[in-house]
Amino acid sequence: MTWRATVLTLFPDMFPGPLGQSLAGRALEGGLWSVEARNLREYGLGRHRVVDDTPFGGGAGMVMRPDVVSAAIRDVAPAGRPLVYPTPRGRPLRQDDVRRYAGGPGLVVLCGRYEGVDERALEACGAEQVSIGDYVLSGGEMAALVLLDSCVRLIPGVMGSDASGTEESFSDGLLEYPHYTKPASWEGRDVPDILLSGHHAAIAGWRQTESETATRTRRPDLWAAHLERTGCTDRQF
């Protein structure tokens, strides 16, 4: 069954964009997934297809109208597909979320613009509000591309090796270990000897240690969650 993505946006020409290249592009051509970009302007009001209005309570910018947004959502009929709204106000997008989305029939992604979407439309349509980081973009389209790419690569048959999806950052709650390739020595920097040893158990242990070290130093939030999940303490590492 083809994994279906529908994107509701004011800029449909942004899709598939970079998702038409590389692994995602080949999977798109091969029918492993599909993407349809619907122009929210089609659901706008009046001769000028108005999609936004001034915010109640005052303030800068414009807000996307609930009647326009909800009409678009109901027209695409998510049919079991989660409705996701990328926004800095959302909960952090996690790899567990990505796996859940990728394991289903697809996604409907609503891309906001201006000051965002009227909250009533999001509540009425049961949108999942997710954030890809603590920063602000011009609109939801770039975040939608990030979200879709993270999902598409987990669809069976997209990546060349199943291990690629299980031996990477966040697959076990830790950041991934570092990678090396030829030449073995480059500008005075050598590949760690253990990776050249052929001792698979020792290599696996080294990679685990490197993952733990990177997570502890770069992502203390993930490290704290790892300690809680495993029941270990810092002193044991």
Curated annotation (Swiss-Prot):
<keyword id="KW-0489">Methyltransferase</keyword>
<dbReference type="InterPro" id="IPR002649">
    <property type="entry name" value="tRNA_m1G_MeTrfase_TrmD"/>
</dbReference>
<keyword id="KW-0819">tRNA processing</keyword>
<dbReference type="GO" id="GO:0052906">
    <property type="term" value="F:tRNA (guanine(37)-N1)-methyltransferase activity"/>
</dbReference>
<comment type="similarity">
    <text>Belongs to the RNA methyltransferase TrmD family.</text>
</comment>
<feature type="binding site">
    <location>
        <position position="112"/>
    </location>
    <ligand>
        <name>S-adenosyl-L-methionine</name>
    </ligand>
</feature>
<comment type="function">
    <text>Specifically methylates guanosine-37 in various tRNAs.</text>
</comment>
<keyword id="KW-0808">Transferase</keyword>
<keyword id="KW-0963">Cytoplasm</keyword>
<dbReference type="GO" id="GO:0005829">
    <property type="term" value="C:cytosol"/>
</dbReference>
<comment type="subunit">
    <text>Homodimer.</text>
</comment>
<dbReference type="InterPro" id="IPR029028">
    <property type="entry name" value="Alpha/beta_knot_MTases"/>
</dbReference>
<keyword id="KW-0949">S-adenosyl-L-methionine</keyword>
<feature type="binding site">
    <location>
        <begin position="132"/>
        <end position="137"/>
    </location>
    <ligand>
        <name>S-adenosyl-L-methionine</name>
    </ligand>
</feature>
<dbReference type="InterPro" id="IPR023148">
    <property type="entry name" value="tRNA_m1G_MeTrfase_C_sf"/>
</dbReference>
<dbReference type="InterPro" id="IPR029026">
    <property type="entry name" value="tRNA_m1G_MTases_N"/>
</dbReference>
<dbReference type="Pfam" id="PF01746">
    <property type="entry name" value="tRNA_m1G_MT"/>
</dbReference>
<protein>
    <recommendedName>
        <fullName>tRNA (guanine-N(1)-)-methyltransferase</fullName>
        <ecNumber>2.1.1.228</ecNumber>
    </recommendedName>
</protein>
<dbReference type="GO" id="GO:0002939">
    <property type="term" value="P:tRNA N1-guanine methylation"/>
</dbReference>
<dbReference type="InterPro" id="IPR016009">
    <property type="entry name" value="tRNA_MeTrfase_TRMD/TRM10"/>
</dbReference>
